[in-house]
A protein has these predicted regions:
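Ankyrin-repeat-protein effector appendages
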Residues: 2-7, 110-128
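Ankyrin-repeat boundary/"N-cap" motif
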Residues: 2-5, 30-40, 64-70, 98-104
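Ankyrin repeat A-helix N-terminal signature
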Residues: 7-12, 40-46, 74-80, 108-114
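Conserved ankyrin/ankyrin-like repeat signature
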Residues: 16, 48-49, 82-83, 115-119
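Ankyrin repeat domain, specifically the short helix-to-loop turn at the C-terminus of the second helix
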Residues: 19-26, 51-60, 86-94, 122-125
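A generic tandem-repeat structural signature
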Residues: 59, 67-69, 73-79, 93-96, ...
Length: 611
């Protein structure tokens, strides 16, 4: 039966195929095979055959293949206008919808050929060159908050225990972002000493008030009080930032709301609570809850907006994992009562198999022309886990005629989206970061690109680990460097690292001995650590390299002709049970022990699945 149907599809024999589908044997054919027939017809560009199969097989348009591709993906690979038009206009499929790797029908058409892309662009009304890809800020940059001043957009994100802390980014097109500063560069001022991995600065908010930029954030520490709300301001987003105040308000995820009358309020969870705030950032009263949430499960990240006489409250719910969503409520009065949006959740868990998941905790921003956008956190799936941590995405926010917000037309997070504004590209400038320490306190960058790193404690130590790292921004990465131990003492080591926190990391290092250097791979998972010697080299200098693809990494030292392939699920948010695991993986350089290591010929390459 299967071979018969496929031959009829190839031949384009509609009448015979229709009779064959009436055969009672057809009722016993598994649905997966029926779906396979439709995909086959779409890939061949047999529009009549596809239409017949869909008409006779209920539910087929909802099916996807093992890569998460739908019938429009398949039709795009054929380049046939009629087949693509049927999938778009009759089956209602989206040319911007991504598969399990974020690949869209427009991407497939582009690979098929220029004519196929031109045809699909004409049919869907969107040009691939006029689109951007989410996430727009890659590598762990969760809990985004945004403010527009004129035609400039500024964003701040959580940084946890990393220094410099609380990165400030700038954009003029909402897609290309440049890090222009940090609220904290000194770990002592930031009070990050002793903070466990996953603690530190959570969910900041940035706002603009009377000519100054304001940032508030929760400091989650291992001391008392366990949670305090940090507040500071600066004349420019680059700083200098005033000495921070730490407000004794429980809860997390603070934001500042300024009403039409100029009165200011600190907004925090549990649920959404508001506390009057002075112009100087001091508390003027006690917190008062105004709404608990839509599903009332782990509500956090509240942001208030005043529009058309309504107070709109945006709030994240469901926790930081795969149940994370964004909901909304509104009221004519600041203190309520608030009415839940009938479309809740307005962003989040629509497709459990989607490439971009864990979406929520965001903030709206209005463009100069009156349009709206919504920035939010998300997580890209890598082998069912979250390797790059929670990142920042942006989608259009539209308003219904009766005044309710809809993010991306309630379709969930987008992989590909039409640009808001003309491109304003910036030069990438990912800064080095270190847990709890300022990178400048133990490292020095030479003009030739080499880096000196003073040896420090083990990466499992809380306050003295010397590592220079970048956020892992893509699932495929290559990191290599020539490591020179001549100024390290015997027993000291230096090399490359993949790092999540003090309980989850690997080190590929040269360890100095009297006769030369050992090439060692160390892996820390929870409270346990393994060590494997991959080889030995004469002398105290050698090249090291790490290649990662998904959760599989390969460590190598060409001078020792040794390689080791290993799995590093411990670098994901889901890699260990317990603790505060919602930051993200980093890669970089580290030195352990007494003395100094020199890194030369440093090369770091991160590759998107689209490349």
């Amino acid at each position: 039966m299967e071979g018969t149907v496929e031959r009829l599809i190839e031949a384009g024999d509609r009448e015979t195929l229709a009779r064959a589908l009436h055969d009672r044997k057809y009722a016993d054919v598994p649905g997966s095979i029926k779906t396979g027939w439709a995909f086959y017809a779409a890939k061949l560009g047999k529009a009549d055959m596809l239409r017949l199969l869909v008409e006779r097989c209920h539910g087929m348009p909802l099916e996807k293949d093992a890569q998460g591709k739908n019938l429009l993906h398949a039709a795009a690979s054929s380049g046939d206008r009629e087949t693509m038009a049927f999938a778009l206009r009759v089956l209602g499929m989206d040319a911007l919808a991504g598969d399990l790797q974020g690949i869209t029908p427009l991407d497939i058409a582009a690979k098929t050929g220029e004519e196929a892309l031109k045809t699909l662009e004409e049919l869907c009304g969107v040009r691939l060159s006029d689109c951007y890809r989410n996430p727009v800020l890659r590598g762990f940059r969760p809990d985004p908050s945004i403010v527009r001043v004129g035609e400039d957009y500024y964003m701040v994100n959580s940084s946890f225990v990393m220094v410099p802390a609380l990165p400030i980014s700038h954009s003029r097109d909402l897609v290309h972002w440049e890090t222009i500063g940090h609220v904290f560069t000194d770990p002592d001022t930031a009070r990050l000493r002793g903070a466990m991995g996953g603690f530190g600065y959570w969910a900041p908010d940035i706002s603009y008030y009377k000519g100054r930029f304001w940032v508030v954030a929760t400091l989650r520490s291992s001391t008392v009080p366990a949670r305090a709300q940090m507040i500071t301001s600066a004349p420019t987003p680059q700083g200098p930032w005033d000495a921070p105040k730490f407000l004794d308000v429980d809860g997390i995820d603070p934001s500042i709301f300024t009403d039409d009358d100029g009165k200011r309020y600190l907004v925090t969870n549990i649920g959404a609570q508001i506390t009057p705030l002075s112009d100087a950032g001091d508390l003027l009263g006690e917190p008062r809850m105004i709404w608990y949430g839509w599903n009332r499960i782990k509500s956090e990240g509240p942001h208030l907006l005043k529009k058309d006489g309504w107070y709109y409250l945006f709030i994240a719910e469901g926790g930081t994992g795969f149940s994370h969503v964004e909901s909304c409520a509104r009221s004519r009065s600041l203190y309520g009562p608030y009415e839940s949006c009938p479309f809740n959740p307005i962003l989040g868990k629509r497709d459990e198999e989607a490439y971009i998941r864990r979406s929520g905790h965001g903030k709206p921003v209005q463009l100069p022309d009156g349009r709206w956008a919504f920035v939010y956190l998300c997580g890209r799936r890598v082998e069912e886990k979250t390797l790059m941590g929670r990142e920042t995405a942006i989608d259009p926010l539209d308003w219904t005629p009766d005044g309710w917000p809809m993010i991306n037309r309630l379709k969930g997070p987008s992989c590909l989206q039409k640009k808001f504004l003309s491109d304003a590209p910036v030069k990438p400038n990912e800064p080095w970061v270190c847990p709890r320490l300022s990178p400048e306190s133990f490292s020095f960058l030479e003009t030739d690109g080499s880096v000196w790193v003073q040896g420090g404690a083990e990466l499992s130590e809380m306050d003295a680990a010397h590592a220079l790292m970048h956020r892992l921004r893509e699932a495929s990465v290559t990191l290599e460097a020539t490591v020179d131990l001549r100024q390290m003492e015997s027993g000291g080591m230096a090399g490359l690292t993949g790092y999540y926190d003090e309980h989850s990391y690997f080190l590929l290092v040269l360890r100095k001995t009297v006769l030369g250097s050992d090439v060692v791979l160390r892996q820390r998972v929870g409270d346990g650590e393994t060590e494997e010697t991959l080889g030995r080299v004469s002398g105290w200098e050698a090249a090291l390299r790490v290649d990662g693809h998904g959760l599989t990494f390969t460590a190598s030292c060409p001078d020792a002709k040794e390689t080791k392939t290993f799995r590093a699920e411990y670098l994901t948010d889901e890699g260990l049970q317990g603790g505060k695991r919602f930051s993200g993986a980093l890669v970089g350089l580290a030195a352990v022990g007494a003395g100094q290591a020199v890194f030369r010929n440093i090369r770091e390459e991160m590759r998107d699945v689209q490349d």
